[in-house]
Every structure is written in C-alpha cells, then in structure tokens.
Amino acid sequence: MKTISNKEYSGERPLFGKSNIKLSNIRIIDGESALKEGHEIGAEKSYFNGKYPFWHIQDLSIDTCAFDTMARAAIWYSQKINMSNCDVVAPKMFRKCSDIRVYQTIFSDAKETFWDCKGIKIDNCSMNNADYLFLNSSNIEINKLKLNGNYAFQNASGIKIVDSIINSKDAFWEAQDVTVINSIINSEYLAWHSKNVTLINCTITGKQPMCYAENLRLVDCILADSTEFAFEYSSVFATIKSHIESVRNPLSGHIRATSIGKIIIDEHKKAPATCVIEENYFG
C-alpha cells in the first residue's frame, strides 16, 4: 500500500481512481470529489474541507481525521467503512452506504446523516443538530450514543440501541423491529405508526407517546409526568415503574403501572378495545 504524506490538495478530483493508498497528514482544502471510484483507502490525521471526498469507495478506513463545514456529503455510495476518533462538522455524512463502523466520533452537524444505509454499528459517539438521522436505514446496532435532533430513525428497521440518550421529536416514526435498552428517550410523539418496538428499562419523556403502534412492548420503563395521552390506538404490553399522566383508548394488550392519573376510554375508542389496565405495579 502506497502512503501519501504531508500533502495539500484542492480543485476537482485530485486523487480520482486511486486505490491501495494510505493518506497521512494530508489536507483537502477545497474543491470536490477528491477521491472517487477507489478501493482499499486509508486516511489518518488528515483534514477535509472539499465536497464529496469519498464517493463510490470500497474498503475505507478513516482515523483521527477532521471533516470541516464544506466537506458535506462526504461518504456516499460506499461499502465497508471504518471511522474512528474523528471530528465531523459537515452535514449529510453517509448516504446509500453499507457495512459501516463508527467509533468514538463527534458529529457536530449530523442532519440528514445515515440515509438509506445498511449494516451500521455505532459505539461511543455523539450526534448533534441531527434532524432526520438514520432515515430509511436498516440493521443498526448502537451503543452509548448521545443524539440531539428531531425525526430520528424514521422508517428505519432492525435497530438495537443500548445505554444511549435520544433527544428527538417524532423519533421512530414508522420504524420496525426496534429494541432499546437502558436508555433515556426524550421525544414528543414517540414511535407513532411503528411496529414491533420493545423498550426495556428506559426512561421516557414527551407528550402523546407511542400511539398507533403495533405490537409495542415496554418492560419496567419509567414515564415522566409529561407523557400524557399515551398508547392511543396501540396494541401494547407494558410494565411501567412509575406514574402515567394519562392513557387514552389503547386497542389491546395489558398495561400495568404504579399509578395512572387518568384512564380515557371514550366514544372514540376503536375495536377491539380489550386492553387490560392495572395500577399498583412497582417492578
């Protein structure tokens, strides 16, 4: 593998088609498509500020690099990607990629990141300004993520999240096959129109959570006082180790909580309307 060190590039396609190379302490200061249509590319201790630097790349390893504001849409249409210890300021990172591993990386402007991607593993990362994160993506494993941004995981599937903090309005809308464990979720209108969502030992805040959900399961979770009108038109099995402000017209299942401020079963209920609701559950 050839090593390219201590170089500075600008303009369009300065390293187009290069393969089997390692970039060390290089700077892409402007331009676009610095590397494209290559394979087996490594980058370390380098700086990117040109658009679209890594498109159509097979086998990409990036460590201790910085992606500045203009390095937007940096990695698209690529496979087998490993990123670690990076600082990403640019938005729209990762689109239509597969087999992605990201470790200990900070995304300061993560909006529209991880769209239409498959096979994602995230460990010990933070993602801010992250609106529409993981849209339409699948097979996602996450450990220790701090996420700030709305509409995360919309229409995503095959998701497992552990020990994370998710601050995201409308998170998990139309998502399928989701498991979240030991995490904090702050989300208005959480998981509406979702299917097969399981939350275990989670703390949940946000109004009108988990409505129109199919096969929703909560195991020993805590719902904050703001979670009013929960579970409307959802099939749900839930054990809640806290007070619930109100529950409204669940479809079916079984809800057990420490206490419930208001149980609303009114003329707007929908069949089968068979959900069993119990209080005095303490876990």
For every predicted segment, state its role.
Residues 1-283:
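Long, distal/terminal scaffolding or interaction modules
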